[in-house]
Amino acid sequence: MDQSVPSENQPETGEGRTIIDIAGIMKMIPHRYPFLLVDRVIDIVRGERGIGIKNVTASESHFAGHFPNHPVMPGVLIIESMAQTAAVLVVDALGTDAEGRVVYFMSIEGAKFRRPVVPGDQLRIECERLQHRGNVWKFRGTARVDGQIVAEASFAAMILRPSPAQQAEA
């Protein structure tokens, strides 16, 4: 049963359609170029799971050194794209309760990388909530290219208000 509920960041619902575009994502998480690693979210079942999309392009700065003449997306950035997709899911689930708070990455377990991700690939990032207790959320993430798993991991995140010093810098 689809439990997606449209919000101001979700003009449409249903797999394959953009339900949170890049502008909506930028309202939900603090990441910006060159470290914003999810382009849109195409499906959400509120508080349970979602699917993000990351278009991998040759113009991304990490490809200059990883590796020259043989660009490969660093695995840690694939994991970060999972974490950012999960952060969008947390903010979406909490709604107005998430205002003024930031989702921080806490831990990772069982990360596996199956094949290289290169410019021109489109990552399909599937995140499923495993547990939610208080401010801590645990997820299982899988990244696919053309239907094949390229990376997977379990990870945890915590949503908190930034410290006064961090807020002053913003």
Curated annotation (Swiss-Prot):
It catalyses: a (3R)-hydroxyacyl-[ACP] = a (2E)-enoyl-[ACP] + H2O. It holds the Pfam family FabA. It comes from the Bacteria. InterPro entries: FabA_FabZ, FabZ, HotDog_dom_sf. Its EC number is 4.2.1.59. The active site is at H66. The keyword Lipid biosynthesis applies. Its main location: cytoplasm. It is found in: Cytoplasm. The keyword Mitochondrion does not apply. Belongs to the thioester dehydratase family. FabZ subfamily. Involved in unsaturated fatty acids biosynthesis. Catalyzes the dehydration of short chain beta-hydroxyacyl-ACPs and long chain saturated and unsaturated beta-hydroxyacyl-ACPs. This is 3-hydroxyacyl-[acyl-carrier-protein] dehydratase FabZ. It comes from Granulibacter bethesdensis (strain ATCC BAA-1260 / CGDNIH1). The gene is fabZ.
